[in-house]
Swiss-Prot record:
Function: Catalyzes the dephosphorylation of undecaprenyl diphosphate (UPP).
Gene Ontology CC, one term: plasma membrane
Chief location: membrane
A Pfam family it matches: BacA
Gene: uppP
GO biological process annotation, one example: peptidoglycan metabolic process
Bilayer topology term: Multi-pass membrane protein
Native source organism of the sequence: Korarchaeum cryptofilum (strain OPF8)
Protein name: Undecaprenyl-diphosphatase
Family, per entry: Belongs to the UppP family.
Subcellular location(s) of the protein: Cell membrane
Catalytic reactions on record: di-trans,octa-cis-undecaprenyl diphosphate + H2O = di-trans,octa-cis-undecaprenyl phosphate + phosphate + H(+)
Coiled-coil portions: none
Length: 262
């Protein structure tokens, strides 16, 4: 892989991981167009960039979640460990992560078939479009609870399939469940951290060290980190203005084009 290709793939990963248009789908398409299949190490590094981006963007929330979890653990002997909403959030994140972990392990041996199909990408983008468009009528003032945490976690699990946007699926589902807009944003982004971390660890385990420590990988990591931060800031402004559904038009156009041409 050349530096220019690494830069392009890193930028695409950074933008599409957080914009609700499916990063996995666009990476699959780019690899088909560039006739170059990225190594597991490179994919891990660009995901590391987007993971760092969300941690930096939500650093206060990440700190508070860790703090609440540790405080909850320390309060276990007193019986009031996870009684407050802030103390419950770490548990909701763990519970919401279970579906994607289970489905990911179940589909591990089918990775090549799933990520080698442009048709799956096309169908996935149409599903994403439907979810995004439905947010025109979504919204509410309900708090996060166990049921909604699990429902959003299930939505995250289907984003394993290329073409289905993780952020699009989780934020749309959170809004459709009646969550407050800021609550939906916060939970969706915090929920992504364990999933991305798990994926990153699995990819690094099977990656030779020489494939990780190279200029192309560094370019991919830095470009995905920088563009990831930009994408998060842009997406937050779109959601807060109630315009998440606008991304559905792009997903429909690209999804139909893929199914028609590839």
């Amino acid at each position: 892989m050349e530096i220019a290709q690494a830069l392009i793939l890193g930028i695409v990963q950074g933008l599409t991981e957080w914009l609700p248009i499916s990063s996995s789908g666009h990476l699959v398409l780019l690899q088909i167009i560039l006739l170059s299949r990225s190594s597991a190490a490179f994919i891990a590094l660009v995901h590391a960039g987007t993971l760092l981006a969300v941690i930096v963007a939500f650093r206060r929330d990440v700190f508070n979640v860790i703090k609440s979890f540790l405080e909850g653990i320390s309060e276990l002997p007193k019986g009031s460990a996870f009684s407050s909403p802030e103390r419950k959030l770490p548990l909701y994140i763990l519970i919401g992560t279970v579906p994607v972990a289970v489905l990911g392990l179940a589909l591990a041996k089918y990775v090549d078939e799933i990520f080698g199909s442009s048709k799956i990408v096309g169908v996935g983008l149409l599903i994403t479009a439907a979810l995004l468009y439905s947010t025109k009528w979504a919204g509410g003032e309900r708090p996060l609870d166990l049921r909604r945490a699990l429902i959003v976690g299930l939505a995250q699990s289907i984003a394993i399939f290329p073409g289905i946007s993780r952020s699009g699926a989780t934020i749309s589902t959170a809004l459709l469940s009646g969550l407050k807009r800021e609550e939906a944003i916060r939970y969706s982004f915090l929920l992504s951290i364990p999933a991305l971390t798990g994926f990153l660890i699995l990819e690094l385990i099977v990656s030779p060290a020489h494939e990780i420590l190279n200029p192309e990988g560094l370019v991919g990591l830095l470009s995905s980190f920088i563009t990831g931060l930009i994408a998060i800031k842009f997406l937050l402004s779109i959601i807060r203005r109630g315009r998440l559904h606008l991304f559905s038009y792009y997903c429909v156009i690209v999804g139909i084009a893929i199914l028609s041409l590839l």
